[in-house]
């Protein structure tokens, strides 16, 4: 997949922040006289952009990716990271306000020249910011600036908010239509995209590009960014409006996406997000490291249109897996990092304990469709292998125009949660021993797989003494038995234990489903899990 190369390049700049540099080559006098936007004024508003995107969809796709000069095309990630934007040329430096914008240099695999515009909201006019080497500092790089001829454009941008102006960015748009944001920890994690096309289809996946951005100049005391974007690809175009609120504990983006299909699209992904899951409490296949867990996200959380809450722990499967969860007008979904305890990761480099979650909240009626989940095998943490998005049920035909409104919440945990008990953790290991522990003198006579699902919250700690807790478990193949319900005082909840036994030689994934209830009252969200049985000759103990 091209996904691997693109995401690997993105990972290389994960630590790249807009740190101010000294000894810059750029001219301070030039910045004071004109600012970064140096183009001619032209009329602009969102309605005009929507018309432009619609008209563009009616014409043949033009690939505008450029051939970069050798000094940029062959550069290493370290060299790319060493290029610094000159903070004195930040887009709104002269405003002396609460917000600012800086730009990423083109280089490595970032060959799409992205055009940037500054918008005056009072006159509704826009002026382009043209690339020129004077905007950047190349002091600690091997870049030959003599090769930087003409307007190369930019690769993307990053947003800053006081009091960290010119120090630590809070939002980053870089590569294709990828973008990310931080929460209170200041740590980047998973990514979102403007659009996904044919992620799991019979043809090769397509990665649309944001090719132009417009930044609405804020008032001096404003604390919200308004950014417009034009998206282009062989199959679709789009006009986007992002209202970005960088709050103290989270970043909230309100997205208005108008999408136009150039061609029929087999699989259209709305509000796509990309993450990484290598290993966790239940999946240890690729965890032979010093770290107990390695992941940006540990679960897909879904709040269905009918009100049901679902927790689907993520996997790092041996083979690619795709699952579609049908729904109508979903209330929300997201890839969530629920565990933020350092001890459970022991990571002082990538800080997985600080990674944010990403939650999607539809603000328009999305109708029928499915929340799709793609899990790709990965051998390490530098390759993102988890993708989730919404796919409309109605086929997308050439000439179709669609509008989706939604909010994106980048925060430690989603802004909403089930009032019922929620899944705290999932664990899996050797089963078949009814003693409740692994006997030291013998192995169980029959092979089985044990699962432990912990539930917490939802008033479980306030249930009357003697309340009967009933686990309701179903499986798509095999059988489940040997149930135990244990009180966990540490989390003020319960642990449900059960064993799965095969009843045939199938190695197809087994879909497990569990919730707990008392009498006829549901007590928890629904746990969904996909288990991959070993081959029949592996279903034995030593």
Swiss-Prot record:
Domain of life: Bacteria
GO molecular function, one term: carbohydrate binding
GO CC terms in record: outer membrane-bounded periplasmic space
UniProt KW keywords: Periplasm, Signal
Post-translational modification as stated in the protein's UniProt record: Predicted to be exported by the Tat system. The position of the signal peptide cleavage has not been experimentally proven.
Signal peptide start-end: 1-31
Metabolic or biological pathway: Glycan metabolism; osmoregulated periplasmic glucan (OPG) biosynthesis
Alphabetical list of Gene3D superfamilies matching this protein: 2.70.98.10, Immunoglobulins
Name this polypeptide is given: Glucans biosynthesis protein D
The species this protein was found in: Pseudomonas fluorescens (strain Pf0-1)
């Amino acid at each position: 997949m091209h996904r691997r190369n693109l995401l690997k390049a993105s990972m290389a700049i994960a630590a790249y922040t807009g740190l101010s540099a000294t000894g810059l080559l750029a001219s301070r006098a030039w910045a004071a006289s004109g600012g970064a936007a140096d183009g001619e004024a032209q009329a602009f508003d969102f309605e005009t952009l929507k018309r432009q995107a619609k008209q563009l969809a009616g014409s043949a796709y033009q690939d505008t990716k450029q051939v970069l000069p050798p000094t940029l095309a062959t550069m290493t990630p370290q060299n790319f990271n060493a290029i610094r934007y000159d903070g004195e040329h930040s887009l709104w430096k002269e405003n002396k306000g609460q917000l600012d914008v800086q730009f990423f240099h083109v280089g490595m695999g970032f060959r799409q020249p992205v055009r940037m515009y500054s918008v005056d909201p009072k006159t509704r006019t826009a002026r382009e910011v043209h690339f020129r080497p004077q905007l950047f500092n190349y002091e600690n790089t091997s870049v030959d600036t003599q090769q930087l001829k003409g307007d190369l454009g930019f690769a993307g941008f990053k947003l800053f908010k006081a009091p960290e102006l010119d120090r630590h960015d809070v939002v980053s748009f870089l590569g294709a239509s990828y973008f990310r944001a931080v929460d209170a920890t200041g740590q980047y994690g998973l990514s979102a995209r403007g659009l996904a096309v044919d992620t799991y289809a019979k043809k090769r996946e397509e990665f649309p590009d944001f090719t132009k951005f417009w930044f609405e100049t804020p008032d001096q005391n404003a604390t919200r960014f308004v950014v417009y974007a034009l998206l282009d690809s062989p199959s679709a175009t789009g006009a986007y409006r992002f209202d970005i609120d960088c709050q103290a504990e989270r970043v909230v983006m309100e997205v208005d996406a108008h999408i136009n299909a150039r061609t029929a699209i087999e699989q259209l992904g709305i509000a796509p997000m990309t993450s990484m899951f290598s290993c966790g409490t239940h999946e240890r296949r690729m965890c032979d490291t010093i770290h107990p867990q390695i992941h940006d996200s540990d679960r897909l959380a879904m709040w269905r249109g009918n009100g049901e809450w679902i927790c689907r722990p993520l996997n790092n499967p041996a083979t690619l897996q795709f699952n579609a969860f049908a729904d109508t007008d979903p209330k929300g979904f997201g890839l969530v990092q629920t565990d933020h305890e350092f001890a459970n990761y022991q990571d002082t480099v990538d800080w997985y304990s600080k990674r944010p979650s990403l939650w999607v909240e539809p603000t328009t009626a999305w109708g029928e469709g499915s929340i799709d989940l793609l899990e790709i095998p990965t051998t390490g943490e530098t390759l993102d292998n988890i993708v989730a998005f919404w796919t409309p049920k109605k086929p997308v035909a050439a000439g179709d125009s669609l509008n989706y409104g939604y909010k994106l919440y980048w925060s430690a945990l989603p802004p909403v949660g089930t009032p019922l008990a929620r899944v705290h953790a999932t664990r899996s290991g050797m089963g078949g021993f009814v003693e409740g522990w692994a006997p030291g003198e013998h192995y169980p006579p029959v092979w089985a797989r044990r699962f432990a699902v912990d539930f917490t919250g939802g008033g479980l700690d306030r249930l009357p003494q003697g309340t009967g807790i009933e686990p309701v478990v179903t499986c798509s193949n095999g059988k489940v038995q040997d149930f135990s319900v244990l009180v966990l005082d540490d989390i003020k909840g319960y642990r449900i234990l059960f064993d799965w036994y095969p009843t045939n030689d199938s190695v197809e994934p087994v879909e497990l489903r569990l919730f707990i209830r008392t009498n006829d009252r549901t007590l928890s969200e629904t746990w969904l899990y996909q288990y991959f049985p070993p081959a029949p000759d592996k279903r034995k103990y030593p």
